[in-house]
Amino acid sequence: MASAMTCSAAELFPHLGSSANATAAAEFICSRFSAVSEYLTNTTYAVDTTYLLFSAYLVFAMQLGFAMLCAGSVRAKNTMNIMLTNVLDAAAGGFSYYLFGFAFAFGAPSNGFIGKHFFGLKEFPSQAFDYSYFLYQWAFAIAAAGITSGSIAERTQFVAYLIYSSFLTGFVYPIVSHWFWSGDGWASASKTDGNLLLRFGVIDFAGSGVVHMVGGIAGLWGAFIEGPRIGRFDRSGRSVALRGHSASLVVLGTFLLWFGWYGFNPGSFLTILKSYDHTIRGTYYGQWSAIGRTAVTTTLAGCTAALTTLFCKRLLVAHWNVVDVCNGLLGGFAAITSGCAVVEPWAAIVCGFIAAWVLIGFNALAAKLKYDDPLEAAQLHGGCGSWGIIFTGLFAKKEYVNEVYPGFPNRPYGLFMGGGGKLLGAQVIQVVVIIGWVSVTMGPLFYLLHKFKLLRISRDDETAGMDLTRHGGFAYIYHDEDEGSSMPGFKMTRVEPTNTSTPDHQNRSVNVVV
């Protein structure tokens, strides 16, 4: 916020001469001046709140991107199921984040581990937080839950989605965001009392670790405990591709996520009307400029990762694959999210280039270990997110670090930028801590769901598809009466379970023209 302007009648009076009305004139001028100053202050709050709300809307729109990406990446027989789980992530996550999540994350005053106030938004808004901030943070929380849903797609019971989504957004994710983003967190770069990890905290500006690693590691445990989908690996252990049914939806979802990322990364500044030191660059330069730079670094990282994936996969598999390119693009975005505000544009290109190789490498490792993740979510968000945190410890620029995190003139910065290895050490600790925390919380949860037979659907249901067996029908309309139609198209075969006794679910297959 801009500093308030002040006016004193006692200071102004000597400048008005010795007229009889000088005192009254000074008081009148100062009263008008105070009114204008208050108006400007209110305008600043309004502009900053509007900026934050707009960013929240962009981040929330990423849920549509996740939904389209997930729908296109699964087989047609599970489309309705995965779409419903994405709606559930937002709805259940909103309720749990309102009751507990926001309080655990930002309920100040608190200790370094967990927040203690604002349960159910009680005593809200406060001087520190407004409702717009809650909305923005909720959008981040459900993004983490959406990442996890992709890892366990096509084989997970609906009740398991409800349980894990509420637990992740209401407890697991908020604790991590408290550690690294709250003003009281033990590793937060925004903490002011100096009682920090290595005395300066970690830099995870928009959440390569807080959001992407949390969602990715949670998905890793879910997919690992469930096991691969039926048919994903043959009897000899070789990988069998279970292609998603719509590359068009994958591309649509990717572009929606790309658009939303401009609220995710630049929006994490929270305010836009903030001046920087004018002696360095002049009055034209302020937080609005840093926001623009953040959008540029985000763009370059994603574009570089997409192009790198395109040509690398062409060399590896001898064809151009749009789905691989989309995943590479998103991997670049996940990686740059940590350091987007504190690195140069050229460094973002380095980030995206290596992120593409990280994703390719983790995908190869997953296939070798017979790990099945339909959306590559654990590899993309967990793997590339981890690289993004390390990248920040290598390439964070001193000037930008001091702009984004003022008040600590001797704060360490990137190793390759001359800042030594302290920040890199803190970033490595963040990676280890997030992996540990999510593993000891989400791992046991998925294991308990598995033991109580609440995690994976039956083999027959999985073979037939959950749209038919769990959700009352297909996501796409099948017109049996059009079977003999001369309309151009291709035939799809509907397969239903063989062990049901109802007349409507007897074993049959119907060829339908689409």
From Swiss-Prot:
First-listed, main subcellular location of the protein, grouped into a coarse class: membrane
Reported induction: By ammonium supply or colonization by nitrogen-fixing bacteria in roots. Down-regulated by glutamine supply in roots. Highest expression after onset of light.
Record GO biological process: ammonium homeostasis; ammonium transmembrane transport
Pfam families: Ammonium_transp
Transmembrane segments annotated in the record for this chain: 52-72, 87-107, 133-153, 158-178, 205-225, 249-269, 290-312, 316-336, 342-362, 375-395, 428-448
One GO CC term, this protein: plasma membrane
GO MF term set: ammonium channel activity
Keyword Magnesium set for record: no
Membrane topology: Multi-pass membrane protein
Location of the protein in the cell: Membrane
Tissue specificity: Root hairs and leaves.
Keywords for the protein's UniProt record, in alphabetical order: Ammonia transport, Membrane, Transmembrane, Transmembrane helix, Transport
NCBIfam families: amt (TIGR00836)
Role, per record: Ammonium transporter probably involved in ammonium uptake from the soil.
UniProt family annotation: Belongs to the ammonia transporter channel (TC 1.A.11.2) family.
Name assigned to this protein: Ammonium transporter 1 member 2
Protein species of origin: Solanum lycopersicum
Gene coding for it: AMT1-2
